[in-house]
């Protein structure tokens, strides 16, 4: 194997050193796992600037790794990275995070065998695969302890999200090539067929599959999405609900069981909220003085006409462009051009060259592609989609969390030109 350029390696090492200095100046002291758990459960998140600087460091480390590995080992290492997910899937399935003690003394392999019933040989290999990715640590032969990462598996939402990623997402990924062949590389107009449907049930999309076939995976998905929800800025941290007139109506389209609307209504009691979702989703949820539950399918024209706000939080990324045009068109027909606005509370992908983008954001994008035919969109892609819906519809403003203007998450405010 040819050695990498000395100048290239030294240049990257110097870049890495400067990036670490900038990150430490921004991030301050490193948080403990307990702080991270508190951050997730209290819905407080690090700043977007801190995230961006962290991912710059990761990207530089990857570039160094690609050079010192050489092209073929680097290529094969990436091709086999699903084996890391397989080991992590087994670890979460066996609940090793609860069996391995978090304390001064490690947990023996014999103890783990007794708790799981799995052979020494298989457990040793599962834990080796995890430990190589700094998830658990073998501190002595057949003696295992927690790392900061493995401790996070004790957080219910994170455990569920990892399980979903190592199960549904990984199996959907294995069907991606078959999906491309079947669809001739053209995305369907809705959620079926998809790589997920090819892996699990050719007649059902993810949400339909969960509700009619596999409620166990469905419950895990809900818990996992709760974990991701806590890492996003709150909509009220971005959009100024106090600016709406007394008695304004906010329609929470696809709002689930109304958690968002109830929370915002407590902070802004001058507003009235209508939460719309499918009957099975809102079943059993009681109305309150400020929040009304309403059965509605986003594929049908919206029955609430002339509302002040139609809010969609993390809805459109679950659907391909054609479906999003249909969903938004069903809202546009209900809007009053003199006062109605649509608020799209979604990720906004940066317009960057592929190699300069954040890997984690790309992984989120590929997750919705594989499971839902969905799409995370850049500003350019959002504008193209919005223009396709209706020539009068335009982005009037993007609301950001204070101090994070231009970050990867914002609320796009759409209005109809009069």
Swiss-Prot record:
Its domain of life reads Eukaryota
Question: What about temperature dependence?
Answer: Optimum temperature is 40-45 degrees Celsius.
Which positions in this protein are listed as binding substrate? 170-176
The induction field says: Zataria multiflora essential oil reduces gene expression. Expression is repressed by curcumin.
The annotated active site, in chain numbering, is 317 (proton acceptor)
- What does its pH dependence look like? Optimum pH is 7-9.4.
Which residues are trimmed away as propeptide when the chain matures?
1-41
Assigned keywords, A-Z = Cytoplasm, Methyltransferase, S-adenosyl-L-methionine, Transferase, Vacuole, Zymogen
Matching entries from SUPFAM superfamilies are given as: S-adenosyl-L-methionine-dependent methyltransferases, Winged helix' DNA-binding domain
Q: Name one Pfam family in it.
A: Dimerisation
The record's similarity note reads: Belongs to the class I-like SAM-binding methyltransferase superfamily. Cation-independent O-methyltransferase family. COMT subfamily.
Q: What is this protein called?
A: Sterigmatocystin 8-O-methyltransferase
Q: What is the species of this protein?
A: Aspergillus parasiticus (strain ATCC 56775 / NRRL 5862 / SRRC 143 / SU-1)
What gene makes this protein?
A: aflP
């Amino acid at each position: 194997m040819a050695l990498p350029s000395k100048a290239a390696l030294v240049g990257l090492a110097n870049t890495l050193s400067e990036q670490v200095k900038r990150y430490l100046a921004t991030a301050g002291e490193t948080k403990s796992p307990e702080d991270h758990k508190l951050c997730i459960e209290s819905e407080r998140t690090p700043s977007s600037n801190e995230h961006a600087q962290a991912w710059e460091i990761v990207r530089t480390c990857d570039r160094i790794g690609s050079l010192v590995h050489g092209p073929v080992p680097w290529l094969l290492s990436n091709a086999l990275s699903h084996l890391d997910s397989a080991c992590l899937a087994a670890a979460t399935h066996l609940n090793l995070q609860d069996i391995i003690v978090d304390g001064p003394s490690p947990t023996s392999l014999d103890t783990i065998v007794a708790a799981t019933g799995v052979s020494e040989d298989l457990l040793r290999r599962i834990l080796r695969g995890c430990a190589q990715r700094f998830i658990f640590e073998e501190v002595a032969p057949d003696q295992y302890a927690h790392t900061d990462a493995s401790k996070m598996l004790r957080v219910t939402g994170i455990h569920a999200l990892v399980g979903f990623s190592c199960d549904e997402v990984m199996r959907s990924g294995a069907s991606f090539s078959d999906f491309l062949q079947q669809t001739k590389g053209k995305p369907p107009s809705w959620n079926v067929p998809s790589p997920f449907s090819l892996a699990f049930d050719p007649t059902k999309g993810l949400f339909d599959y969960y509700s009619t076939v596999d409620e166990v995976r469905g419950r895990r998905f809900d818990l996992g999405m709760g974990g991701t929800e806590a890492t996003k800025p709150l909509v009220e941290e971005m959009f100024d609900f106090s600016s709406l007139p007394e008695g304004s109506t906010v329609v929470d389209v696809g709002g689930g069981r109304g958690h968002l609307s109830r929370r915002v209504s407590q902070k802004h009691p001058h507003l009235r909220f209508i939460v719309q979702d499918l009957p099975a989703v809102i079943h059993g949820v009681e109305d309150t003085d400020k929040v009304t539950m309403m059965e509605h399918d986003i594929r049908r024209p919206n029955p609430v006409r002339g509302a002040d706000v139609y809010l969609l939080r993390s809805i459109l990324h679950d659907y391909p462009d054609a479906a999003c045009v249909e969903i938004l068109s069903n809202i546009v027909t209900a809007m009053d051009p003199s006062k109605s606005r649509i608020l799209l509370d979604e990720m906004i992908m940066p317009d960057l060259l592929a190699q300069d983008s954040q890997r984690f954001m790309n992984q989120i994008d590929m997750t919705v592609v594989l499971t839902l035919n969905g799409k995370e969109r850049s500003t350019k892609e959002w504008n193209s989609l919005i223009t396709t819906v209706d020539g009068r519809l335009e982005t009037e403003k993007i609301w950001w969390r204070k101090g994070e203007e231009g970050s990867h998450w914002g609320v796009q405010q759409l209005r109809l030109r009069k």
